[in-house]
Regions:
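Short alpha-helical segments enriched in small residues
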Residues: 1-165
């Protein structure tokens, strides 16, 4: 996806949120705030983007958005339970309507047989108590994995929560 197409996707998501009078928050690890960046590239995004949390370290995940240390120790940062807690914690801290959380292994190092480089977990939650998780394994270099994760997060929010509601 080109930068222009990514901007168009951000605009579509933003318009849908604005039409609902809803706000979005993000909790990002491996993407390092890339989702928040492409969202805030859109003029007027303050109407629907509340805030973004870049929680790269486990300590940041625990301190900023309340991910339990026991969850991190038991499952590791790149896991379904962690992205669930990240999304719920971001919603709570930001008092937003929708949350996206992302934690993954962008590479080139850090992968294992169980969690290879390119593994990314996503969490999506709403203030209405809805939520889903997704796991993807992207290929390519570090920047490519991070870009693909950013695109996937926005597309999934759109398709699962905003498109037909």
């Amino acid at each position: 996806m080109t930068d222009h197409e990514l901007m168009q996707l951000s605009e579509v998501v933003g318009l849908a949120l604005k039409q609902r009078g809803a706000t979005l928050t993000t909790a990002e690890s491996c993407t390092g705030g890339w989702v928040a960046k492409v969202i805030t590239d859109i003029a007027g995004s303050s109407a629907w983007f509340e805030r973004g949390f870049v929680t790269y370290s486990n300590e940041a995940k625990a301190q900023m958005i309340g991910v339990r240390e026991s969850t991190l120790e038991q499952h590791g940062a790149v896991s379904e339970p962690v992205v669930i807690e990240m999304a719920i914690g971001a919603l709570k801290e930001a008092r937003a309507d929708y949350a996206i959380s992302i934690s993954g292994i962008a590479g080139p190092d850090g992968g294992s047989d169980v969690k290879p480089v390119g593994t990314v977990w996503f969490g999506f939650a709403t203030s209405r108590g809805e939520g889903i998780t997704r796991r993807e394994c992207f290929s390519g270099d570090r920047e490519s994995v991070r870009r693909q994760a950013t695109v996937y997060a926005l597309k999934t929010l759109w398709q699962q929560f905003l498109q037909n509601t």
